[in-house]
């Protein structure tokens, strides 16, 4: 049995006071397992955001997002087209074979403002 996760290291945002239509609801905090799990349970996910400092310089900060409206997939209602079903039959599927490699493959280093950095890879690997 795994050890219980530590609590979030900072107070997460109360979404009931978030402005309607605002997707970015907080900036800051850290990517430790307790914070990640607490955030996901509250409908938040982390993704870096570009910020402009007082001198006009730009940098990245950890943003916490809760899209409004949020896209939700209901598996029981999912309609799979024939072309998708055909494509899926030609694929190999596995579970828990190479978690870190999969996360790294989701990162696109050539994409401007790509947010899956090594910090994210390490955080999700620790959580996994």
Summary of predicted features, one role per range:
Residues 1-128:
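N-acyltransferase acceptor-side catalytic subdomain
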């Amino acid at each position: 049995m795994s050890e219980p996760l530590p609590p979030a290291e900072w107070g997460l945002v109360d979404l009931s006071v978030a402005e309607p239509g605002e997707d970015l609801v907080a900036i800051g905090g850290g990517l430790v397992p307790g914070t990640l799990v607490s955030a996901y349970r509250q409908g938040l996910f982390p993704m870096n955001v570009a910020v402009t400092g007082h001198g006009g310089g730009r940098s990245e900060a950890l943003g916490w997002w809760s899209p409004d409206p949020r896209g939700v997939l209901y598996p029981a209602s999912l309609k799979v087209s024939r072309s998708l079903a055909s494509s899926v039959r030609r694929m190999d599927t596995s579970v828990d074979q190479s978690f870190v490699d999969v996360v790294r493959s989701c990162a696109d280093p050539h994409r401007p403002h790509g947010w899956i950095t090594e910090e994210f890879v390490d955080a999700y690997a620790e959580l996994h």
